[in-house]
Swiss-Prot record:
The keyword Nucleus applies. Residues 39-64, 171-186, 233-246 have a biased composition (Low complexity). The gene is z. Residues 66-146 bind DNA. Pfam families: Myb_DNA-bind_5 (PF13873). This is Regulatory protein zeste. Residues 153-162 have a biased composition (Gly residues). Self-associates forming complexes of several hundred monomers. One of its GO terms (molecular function) is DNA binding. Residues 31-70, 148-246 are annotated as: Disordered. Involved in transvection phenomena (= synapsis-dependent gene expression), where the synaptic pairing of chromosomes carrying genes with which zeste interacts influences the expression of these genes. Zeste binds to DNA and stimulates transcription from a nearby promoter.
Amino acid sequence: MSAAGDAGAGAANGSNNVAVVQATVSVSGNISVGDGSPNNNNNNNANGNTNGNSNNNGSTAGSSKGQLPLTPRFTAEEKDVLYTLFHLHEEVIDIKHRKKQRNKYSVRDTWDKIVRDFNSHPHVSAMRNIKQIQKFWLNSRLRKQYPYRDGSASGGSAGLGKVGTVSASAQQQQQQQQQQQQQQQQQHHDSVKVEPEYQISPEASEHNPQGEPFDEIEMDGNDVSEMEDDPLEAQQQQQQQQQQQQQAAAQAQAEAQQQQQQQSAVAEMQKLQVSAAVAAANASMLNTHRINVDSISAEKLTLNDLLHFKPARHDEIILQIKHPTDATATQIHTIPAQPQQHTMATITAGGYNQQIISEIKPQQITLAQYQAQQHQQAQARLRPGQAQQLAQQQLAAQQQQLAVAAAAAHQQQNSSSAAAVVVQQHQQQQQQQQHQQQQQQQQVQQQQQQQQQAAAAAAAVKMQLTGGTPTFTFSALPTVTAATSVPVTVPVPVTVPVTAAPAAVSNVSVSGAGTLPTGAQQQLQLQQQQQQQQQQQQQQQQAGDSYEERINYFKVKEAELRCKEQQLATEAKKIELNKAQDELKYMREVHRLRVEELKMKIRILQKEEEQLQKCSST
């Protein structure tokens, strides 16, 4: 069924020529139907179908099939039975009253029940199926013959009183029109039935029941049994019967409308009386239980009440309240949904070292870069050590030359021996220079070895770390530092014999000479040996200390960061606490305002009540 109403229902069974129905509404609310096409045989069979007479024969194509017999119309008694049944099950079958949770199965069950009740009723002359009854329901609601309800009912009942305004004379005129039209259309073996009470509601305020979609009323046409006969005489007889039934039905409807108007007026009077009695009872109750507004206060409420107190306008009120700390503040205090996290507060146990390293050096270093840095640092440490050694050796040579010159001045007599001493000293100097060159060569070789070792270590560590992240972690530290610090101590065994050799030579060679130079030389050489030993010890200590220092530095950093983390956690908790306290203040304020508002409402109502009492007493 389409939402256009019942008008096209008859044409649905396959007739090819569609009838155009023009409805003209006269002043008195009557309807005259003119056919748009003169040869609309069989189309309009169901068009005017007023009281929903359930003609399930449908219209067939004109010459191919004979006409099916019309089922007899509903009598007035049957209509009353159906109206009462509809009224009983109205909440389910009526679209206006149907709730969303009602599914179509419950609707279908109620329709089945209506059909059963109707067919089992004693006043029913012929059995009807669900399709016919549903069609009657639709048509009767379209023509506003149902629902006959008093003013109490909701929905489309507002315009029902107007139905009775159609006068009996208008009905008689319409019946005459019907008879004429039916006599004309008997030539086409068809009948157009026009209803007296079909009235389009002129008010836009009441929404037309005609405009309701019929899809919501589930129709199942499975059990419509079509009988094939073509007795034309039987059809003409049925049409005459229908005319008589129509006249009887129109009279019955007019009577029913008058009765119903009287009933609705009586019911409205009764309702007014009841509502007045209820109002009086309420007023007396209020007088006995007088509310003392001043005794109400927001302070008496407990914390739980406040927490459970969440009115609908909670947020709007909060926006109007100023922040408690700022007397002049106008900004709105928003509470972020997620607590803001500090960057260091995200450290977990697993990624802790990583986070510390990136905190100390914000740029992340790959392993190769780190090893290159370490290598440069080691070379930088070696260079000043070499420079010191060279400077000390030069100083020693100058001191020896000075001492030799002094000895030569004292021992001019022993010129030959002095010359021999000078020659020996030159030889010693040459030997020392050779030794120095050898030392430098050895140091260069050591540096090359160090570089090779460091490269090998780097390759090994890279092989280990290829599976992991390229960023630097603590696990690489001890291996790299060991690789750099171990070779630093290598010059120790080499330098000891080198420095000891000239001392032995000088002791041997100068022993025959004067006592003064030999003592001075021995002291100088002892000082040199002590200085070199101190340097070596310092280098060893530096190598060991640098590793320990680094570890200690990282430990200190870690402790500092842990401390920072705890401080941040406590700060976050403090912030949360402050927020919660602020929220509580807001809740209290909101609640106080709400209570004040309710007090005002109660006062207003009390004043209105007093005025009403005065009015009623006067």
